[in-house]
Amino acid sequence: MNAITTIKCPQCRKETTLAGNPYRPFCSQRCKMIDLGTWADEGYRIPGEKAPESGGEEPGDE
């Protein structure tokens, strides 16, 4: 059984094949670079309370 596995690109939602795709899980280099740019700009965040600002001292520093 040689079923072709297809997935949706996480960026543009276009159907793409998994096997033989050098940009997987993305459909193209463009979508891969858009996602990388979002990571670099800290566009992906976990929801929650903002972390307190550090005063430059780490716990245990005396």
UniProtKB/Swiss-Prot annotation:
One of its GO terms (biological process) is regulation of DNA-templated transcription. Pfam families: YacG. Zn(2+) binds at C9, C12, C27, C31. Binds 1 zinc ion. GO terms for molecular function: zinc ion binding. Residues 43-52 have a biased composition (Basic and acidic residues). Residues 43-62 are annotated as: Disordered. Its cofactor is Zn(2+). InterPro entries: DNA_gyrase_inhibitor_YacG, Znf_NHR/GATA. Keywords: Metal-binding, Zinc. Interacts with GyrB. Inhibits all the catalytic activities of DNA gyrase by preventing its interaction with DNA. Acts by binding directly to the C-terminal domain of GyrB, which probably disrupts DNA binding by the gyrase. HAMAP family: DNA_gyrase_inhibitor_YacG. Belongs to the DNA gyrase inhibitor YacG family. PANTHER family: DNA GYRASE INHIBITOR YACG (PTHR36150:SF1). This is DNA gyrase inhibitor YacG. The gene is yacG.
